[in-house]
A protein has these predicted regions:
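Conserved small/polar residues in nucleotide/adenosyl-binding loops
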Residues: 224-231
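Acidic/His metal-coordination segments adjacent to aromatic residues that form catalytic metal sites
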Residues: 98-102, 152-169
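Short, solvent-exposed segments of well-ordered alpha helices
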Residues: 100-111, 166-174, 232
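Short, solvent-exposed loop/edge-beta patches enriched in aromatic
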Residues: 86, 102, 109-136, 144
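Long, well-ordered core segments of solenoidal/helical folds
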Residues: 78-89, 136-154, 201-223
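Well-ordered alpha-helical scaffold segments within catalytic/enzyme domains
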Residues: 115-130, 178-197, 233
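Low-complexity, Ser/Thr/Pro/Gly-enriched N-terminal "stalk/linker" regions
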Residues: 26-98
């Protein structure tokens, strides 16, 4: 009988200890909320994209000054791409990485498209006459139609462990980060010209950046250490 009482006491203490541990483990600390109040945040945050160090697309005098002697060179580079055929990356190009280890078959058209989009953006910023807008629209639209901006060599980090993009899961790598940044700049500078043609393209760009970059970065457990570092939580 005594042994039974001792056993019950032991189990009771163990259970209470476990509950206490769980309560402490899941206590909300809210470090960021305690670090600053609303008034402090209003003084610290830079709103309405005032942090952008570049002039508006329509400020031609500023862009002429910024481009300087490079203006004509950038325009000429864009002119070579006015008839550029945006390259489709087939499923087999992604699969080639897991079949043979060859990543270039996917990266070659991927890099060509991204470089073309970048060159067209710089050309339009340099000239400002709208000649490159349609091709920029084509490139941005094509980019939004891709299932992923991640390189095939990095896609095995998906839950599927395969090198073909899985629409059910978005991950981030250096390639997708760079592509997302480029798309963000294209949207920032040319949203109004795009909207005059069709506002759907700007909506697609924002949707693609949110789903492929912002959401996985903010929600994935694997990026917690980066978010903590950037928000100062380690302090």
């Amino acid at each position: 009988m005594n042994r039974m009482k001792h056993l019950l006491c032991f189990l009771l203490v163990a259970t209470l200890g476990s509950l206490s541990f769980k309560a402490n483990a899941y206590t909300e600390r809210n470090m960021l909320q305690k670090a600053a109040d609303e008034a402090t945040l209003k003084n610290v945050l830079v709103m309405k994209q005032a942090w952008v160090p570049y002039p508006a697309y329509t400020d031609r005098a500023a862009w002429d000054s910024l481009m300087g002697p490079n203006k004509q060179r950038l325009i000429a580079a864009g002119e070579k791409l006015l008839d550029y055929k945006w390259k489709l990356i087939p499923a087999t190009a992604y699969l080639e990485y897991e079949r043979s280890g060859n990543r270039k078959v996917m990266e070659a058209p991927y890099d060509a498209n991204r470089q073309a989009l970048n060159a067209l953006m710089l050309a339009e910023l340099a000239e400002g006459k709208g000649r490159f807008i349609d091709q920029l629209l084509n490139g941005a639209y094509m980019s939004c139609e891709m299932n992923s901006w991640v390189l095939s060599a990095h896609l095995p980090r998906q839950s599927s462990k395969r090198s073909l993009p899985d629409f059910r899961e978005q991950i981030i790598d250096l390639g997708s980060g760079g592509y997302g940044a480029l798309m963000a700049w294209v949207h920032y500078f040319f949203r109004k010209p795009f909207d005059k043609i069709n506002p759907v393209v700007s909506l697609q760009i924002r949707k693609a950046i949110k789903e492929r970059i912002l959401d996985p970065y903010m929600n994935a457990v694997s990026y917690t250490h980066l978010r903590a570092h950037e928000t100062g939580a380690y302090l």
